């Protein structure tokens, strides 16, 4: 089974740059009703930022996490 066959018919995969702020990622998650975004470097996947990563950041750093770049909170 290929990845393409698994995600076929699902919501589009959203990617952001490593410089994207968590604040913008939260907006994308809400807007697209998704739980994670890929962190991209051109066409290469560098990591993923999930709701869980953001929740952990909020617990550890409070609201300051919202102004943190994706590269600093992503799982890779």
Region spans (language model):
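Tandem CBS (Bateman) regulatory domains
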Residues: 1-12, 26, 50-76
């Amino acid at each position: 089974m290929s990845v393409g066959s698994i995600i076929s018919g699902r919501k589009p995969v959203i990617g952001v740059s490593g410089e994207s702020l968590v604040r913008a990622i939260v907006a994308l998650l809400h807007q697209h009703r998704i739980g994670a975004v890929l962190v991209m470097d051109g066409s290469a996947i560098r990591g993923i930022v999930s709701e869980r990563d953001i929740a952990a950041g909020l617990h550890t750093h409070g609201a300051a996490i919202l102004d943190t770049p994706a590269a600093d909170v992503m799982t890779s």
